[in-house]
Amino acid sequence: VDERLRCNLNRDKHITIFGSSKQGKTCLRKHCLNKNDYILVQCSNRWSLSDLNANILKRAGYELTESTNVTYEGKAKVSASVKILDATLGGEAGGGATKNVTHRQLELDLSDVNDIIGALNEADFHQYIVLEDFHYLKSEVQKDFAIELKAFHESSKLCFIIVGVWLDENKLVIY
């Protein structure tokens, strides 16, 4: 099982690790991935799709604050800021490399997958995104996020690893 997961990590496709409770799903993930290779989002049963997307952005390094502008649905947009390290060679008399920190400010609609993809691309984010306990999300949120996964796959190089308790092999595909 370990080798099969490692092989699939190199395929640029989303991965689901599923099964019944207490079967070693999280242990498998921890065993096969280095901590620096992923961000971990622990799902909650109280989250909406926007909450899930906000948590992904926060774990990716964004600071989120509510904006005064609204989406076409009348919901408040979010102002997102991320620190970008720019390494410059040469620099001062010491001859070493210098690092400049710049902040990128974006205005996002957390329910728009295109905004989320754009923000992660803007931050030059390349880690795996692990969604642990995906089954805790409401069915509607699971369905909506399964649809977003298609956009993430087609419009970015981002790879999600979804860990959850269910027995249906096609759980996310049927959406």
Residue ranges and their predicted role:
Residues 168-175:
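Short regulatory helix/loop adjacent to the ATP-binding pocket of P-loop NTPases
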Residues 2-129, 136-143, 157-158, 164:
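P-loop NTPase nucleotide-binding core
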Residues 145-157:
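Conserved catalytic/switch belt of AAA+ P-loop NTPases
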Residues 56, 146-149, 173:
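Hydrophobic alpha-helical segments
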